[in-house]
C-alpha cells in the first residue's frame, strides 16, 4: 500500500496505473484524462487495477460500479474512489 499521508487520491491511482504499465514494459505515465486502454492496459490489467484500488483505499467497489467507463482514466477512477469514500466505511473498519 502506498503512503496515504504522502499523496492525493489522484497520485495514488496514478502510481497504481504506472506500476501496471511498468509490468507490461511501458515506461510512460498517462495524464489524468488519458484512456488507459489506449495507454497500454488490457482488460485483465483493468480488473487488476480494480482490485488494487480496493486494496489501496481499503474499500469495496460495488458490482454496479464495476463498469469500464469508471476505469477509463485516472480522473474517472479518482472520482469513483471519492464517491465511494463519501458513502461508505472502510472494509477493515
Q: Where are the predicted features?
A:
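Phosphopantetheine-dependent thiolation modules in NRPS/PKS and related acyl-activating systems
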Residues: 2-41, 45-51, 55-93
Amino acid at each position: 500500500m502506498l503512503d496515504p499521508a504522502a499523496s492525493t487520491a489522484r497520485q495514488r491511482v496514478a502510481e497504481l496505473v504506472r506500476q501496471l504499465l511498468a509490468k507490461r514494459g511501458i515506461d510512460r505515465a498517462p495524464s489524468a484524462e488519458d484512456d488507459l486502454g489506449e495507454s497500454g492496459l488490457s482488460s485483465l490489467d483493468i480488473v487488476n487495477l480494480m482490485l488494487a484500488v480496493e486494496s489501496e483505499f481499503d474499500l469495496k467497489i460495488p458490482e454496479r460500479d464495476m463498469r469500464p467507463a469508471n476505469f477509463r482514466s485516472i480522473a474517472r477512477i479518482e472520482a469513483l474512489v471519492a464517491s465511494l469514500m463519501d458513502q461508505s466505511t472502510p472494509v477493515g473498519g
